[in-house]
Amino acid sequence: MWLHTGPFCIHPRPLLVSDSAVSSFIPAPLRCGRFELTFERPLVMGILNATPDSFSDGGRFLARDDALRQAERMIADGVDLIDIGGESTRPGAPPVPLDEELARVIPLVEALRPLNVPLSIDTYKPAVMRAALAAGADLINDIWGFRQPGAIDAVRDGNSGLCAMHMLGEPQTMQVGEPRYGDVVTDVRDFLAARAQALRDAGVAAERICVDPGFGFGKAVVDDNYALLAALPDTAPARPDGRAYPILAGMSRKSMLGAVIGGKPPMERVAASVAAALCAVERGAAIVRVHDVAATVDALKVWNAVRAAARQ
């Protein structure tokens, strides 16, 4: 859930994941620009790719009017946040020139801001971060974990939410060969802890930070990704107050799903994507990043109804 920030803000009861072994994993609230995200239920982040070459929907929403219609459709379907991307980060994707990325995403931020839904920008470029925040973005979602020179300086001030993701390597080469880890869960958690600490050392409040284990980004397609999903609560480092940083999980239509459902192409991975989202929220994910908003929202309504009945 999101609430407008102001002089006062009431925090509803936080999410209790389940009565299972992960029931003590309670996401802390996340400050997110104009909003405060209070996770008494998991939130759905809808993907809006203003790109010609994204692995699943490349080219469908490159035109501004098409992108705006898709955003309005997601809002009607019950989306909680919209994540706007102007550069594909699929394995092997080439970088996009700065001016081109700005031209793709900034007009969308400006056009969507009046719709009163939290807006996230999927970028690793400091100049895009600055421009997006100036245009009214509420969250910066960085696959590089704010490791690019100038990235932390670009986001240090203000109240925007910041999502630091784990990636081994870089998009062009991250899936070349088999990624190697000592222990993937420990390695990912240690990396995310270091990135959160780097942000905090620069003066960023812990309440602005969330983390993403980076499914599909420099991970063995089956072994690493499913190990991370199975142990999802263990990937989140602790904040100074002892609560876990909120987890954003993005598995929608990815190859880790295709690999276990007979190699179906991305557009035929909807059911698998919804199943993965449910597995993630059962294991404590605060936000799931998805292409298929309506299906995910409906599935989570059923999941929440079961949880409510179990509490009675």
Language-model segments: residues:
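Short acidic capping loops at alpha-helix termini that bridge into adjacent secondary structure
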Residues: A205-R208
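N-terminal amphipathic alpha-helix/helix-capping segment at the start of soluble metabolic enzymes
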Residues: L16-N49
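Catalytic domains of carbohydrate-active enzymes, especially glycoside hydrolases
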Residues: R73-G85
